[in-house]
């Protein structure tokens, strides 16, 4: 591609930036500005990063004490009338559209104990900060006291990730 001298910005993106929450993919983008001043060959690079945050749930031994349990996530992009639901059998993560600087995500845990525990259904609400290109896993496990018969849950957040850089070469005929 031949360009005149001047200032340019290259932008790359992939995915759809319209879904407030998705299980099938997310939007990534990146850009880089550069100047041409008579060079005959110019190589630039840019880094594309997700504009979504990734959330997962790990339920541990919940079937022992609860007949039903699930988590719903709320964000500003989902609005007040919509949530992303993680059912007890789900395994795929949710990708949540977030504000550029990140935002507080509300995780609401719904618990229905088995009848032998003579406890009412409960809801636990937790809020956690999440930024684009970041992830956390909500770890939920039962907490039962044999002596008192109290049934509850233990909740932890794991913010660990396994980042793998991927280099992509764009053929010149695509430009």
Regions found by a protein language model. Name each.
Residues 15-51, 113-160:
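Structured interaction patches on ligand/partner-binding surfaces of diverse proteins
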Residues 41, 63-66:
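Short, structured coil/loop segments at alpha-helix boundaries
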Residues 2, 29, 39, 58-61, ...:
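Glutamate identity and glutamate-enriched acidic tracts
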Residues 158-174:
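Short, low-complexity, Pro/Ser/Thr/Gly-rich segments in the mature regions of secreted, periplasmic
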Residues 37-42, 55-58, 70-76:
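Eukaryote-skewed repeat-based solenoidal scaffolds used as protein-protein interaction platforms
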Residues 47-62:
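A short, Gly/Thr-enriched small/hydrophobic beta-strand-prone motif that recurs across taxa
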Residues 1-19, 67-136, 171-175:
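Tryptophan-paired
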């Amino acid at each position: 591609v031949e360009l005149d001298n001047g200032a340019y910005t290259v932008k790359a993106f992939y995915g759809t930036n319209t879904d407030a929450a998705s299980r099938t993919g997310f939007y990534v983008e990146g850009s880089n500005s550069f100047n041409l001043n008579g060079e005959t060959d110019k190589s630039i690079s840019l880094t594309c990063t997700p504009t979504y945050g990734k959330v997962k749930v790990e339920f541990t031994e919940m079937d022992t004490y609860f007949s039903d349990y699930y988590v719903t996530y709320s964000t500003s992009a989902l609005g007040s009338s919509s949530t992303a639901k993680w059912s007890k059998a789900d395994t795929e993560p949710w990708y949540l559209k977030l504000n550029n600087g990140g935002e507080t995500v509300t995780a609401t845990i719904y618990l229905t104990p088995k009848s032998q525990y003579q406890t009412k259904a409960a809801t636990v609400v937790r809020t956690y900060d999440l930024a684009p290109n970041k992830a956390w896993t909500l770890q939920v496990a039962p907490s039962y006291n044999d002596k008192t018969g109290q049934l509850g849950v233990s909740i932890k957040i794991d913010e660990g990730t396994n980042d793998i850089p991927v280099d992509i070469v764009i053929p010149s005929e695509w430009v």
